[in-house]
Curated annotation (Swiss-Prot):
Residues 136-158, 256, 363-377 are mitochondrial intermembrane. It comes from Gibberella zeae (strain ATCC MYA-4620 / CBS 123657 / FGSC 9075 / NRRL 31084 / PH-1). Residues 48-61 have a biased composition (Low complexity). ATP binds at Y448, G472, P473, S474, G475, C476, G477, K478, S479, T480, L481, L482, R483. Residues 1-23 form a transit peptide. It is an enzyme of class 7 (translocase). Performs an essential function in the generation of cytoplasmic iron-sulfur proteins by mediating the ATP-dependent export of Fe/S cluster precursors synthesized by NFS1 and other mitochondrial proteins. Hydrolyzes ATP. Binds glutathione and may function by transporting a glutathione-conjugated iron-sulfur compound. This is Iron-sulfur clusters transporter ATM1, mitochondrial. The chain crosses the membrane at residues 114-135, 159-182, 232-255, 257-277, 344-362, 378-399. It comes from the Eukaryota. GO terms for molecular function: ABC-type transporter activity; ATP binding; ATP hydrolysis activity. InterPro entries: AAA+_ATPase, ABC1_TM_dom, ABC1_TM_sf, ABC_transporter-like_ATP-bd, ABC_transporter-like_CS, P-loop_NTPase, Type_1_exporter. Homodimer.
Amino acid sequence: MIPQLLQRSSRACPRYNPALYRLSTTSQQRPGLTQTFWTSAPRREQPRTPTDSKPTTTKPSAVFPANKKATKQNDPLVTVEKSAPEQRKADWAIMKEMTRYLWPKDDWGTKLRVSLAVSLLIGAKVLNVQVPFYFKSIVDSMNIDVAAVGGTATTVAGAMILAYGASRIGATVFQELRNAVFASVAQNAIRKVACNVFDHLLRLDLTFHLSKQTGGLTRALDRGTKGISFILSSMVFHVLPTALEISMVCGILTYNYGAKFAALTVLTMVSYTAFTIWTTAWRTKFRRQANAADNKASTVAVDSLINYEAVKYFNNEKFEVARYDKALGQYEKNSIKVATSLALLNSGQNIIFSSALTGMMYLAANGVAEGTLTVGDLVMVNQLVFQLSVPLNFLGSVYRELRQSLLDMETLFNLQKVNANIKEKAGAKPLVLSKGGEIKFENVNFAYHPNRPILRDLSLTIPAGKKVAVVGPSGCGKSTLLRLLFRSYDVQGGRVLIDDQDIRDVDLESLRRSIGVVPQDTPLFNDTVEHNIRYGSINATHEEVVAVAKRAHVHNTIQSFPDGYETKVGERGLMISGGEKQRLAVSRILLKDPPLLFFDEATSALDTHTEQALMMNINSILRERGRTSVFVAHRLRTIFDSDLIIVLKEGHVAEMGTHRELIDRDGVYAELWSAQETMFGEDGKEKSEEENDEQKKN
């Protein structure tokens, strides 16, 4: 009995032992609950096998799609084949959306620039059409024996030559001025659309971002923004002006040279346009497939580079290169189809135009032979037809590029159409902490997948201003509590309250501003140490940054860096250690200074000495400011002094109380504590099986 009391006393009054913080290598020998609990290594919640009791779930599909087909249909980055009417409807919707940026309601500066650009464009087209007339006059004027009449080129055709040159120069000047005037309109639209999409992406919930790969997303954004400028310029400078120029040329040919020229011109226009539209529509699927392959290749490359260390640790460079080569091979295959179909389109367009040009020249030459037309008329017809070739070829290429840009922008606008599962109620009021930050989970049910519930009718209360620990085996729902509290996900049954306010009824920004999180896997930006700390409060001064760094016991470490607080931490903070990253995360949260704090294995990467000093500082801050704090922990030594310890098991509360109460209860927590307490000897070495058996006998 006495040895048992001594052992019970030891569990209730823990002694500091550095060996207790080492990673256990014998955990696999421990059955049941203790098997998954003794490591402080990075963990993921694995949903447990469902039992007979199933919680009521309201919208499980909002968290995890029911099937792959639904996922593909709802993914804005996935290529979905459309019928011709559906594609036209989508294209017109994009064009309509772009008119908002081309002709904004209250932006008179943009309207003025667009109007001026259109005026310059019309002027350029009118001057272009004048050029063949002047050329005809020059040829007819020179089609005499100039020496016989005692004249010179200047006296015979000087005025026409000057007019010819002035028209060409004027058309070029007007066209370049038009480009300069319109540049600000296009760039402003690109900026607005890109910012709108980026803002929308940041507002989407965690479900969307966990299911998307960064490489494909950034590639789609890049292509879409590049297409904006072309679509805007096409709407203003290509489609309508080209149609205007074609109409003017056709009208001149008809008026000056009769019905035969008119009929041939109309036939050419109809054939050329129909062939271009049909062939381009047929080519669209190849371009869409090439875009999808491009997204995949970009995703593979970014994913491999982000996880560079994992690639090196497992010597999988060849495997990653093979993956990338496979993705590029698919892109190559689809790009060849695009290039081949483009060659077919260009060939067909040239055949149609060359046939029309041949017919026109025959009719004009026949008119000269009959004496009804002059040589100047022959030249003018040739010039007009060639002048017609420019807008025709341009219209063909514009249509091709327009289709490409519309496809790219379709993905961009599809991203804007993605609805967030987490929505703020209309008229939601800011969160008011009238009780100091009391948190309640009432009959909460939640599952990431409909068939794998995580929380089952969970009810618990976290008192205001207290330090509360949440412990339990991996997959029991500890980190899920934070995600629900932060509204990264919504509960599927029950409710979450903060000071008696349902978090679904309060303003999202005020809710998230009131919660501070120190995650186990600390997210850092590829920027300076100071920037990463200041991210907790963007307007903080350098002195405030240094102050919180000192409280987090990381100031001296930062001072030892090559550039101190200006040292770059690298991609995702990979240039500093895990412990340094966690202390920067603690500094960041101290700078934010929210009323509710959540620490998710926040010291798992620290050595015991630093961890102990840091926890003393954190505890003093919590007591001093009366903050409500929640600590998720596997190592019970770090949370035994909590005001309340909540033990989760299989999605519900197994027991709760103080450390001493739970030890006296001799339940799940006592089993966990005993396993960790007895795993190491006083010398810091793992106990042998004989030593453990001897202790059990006592």
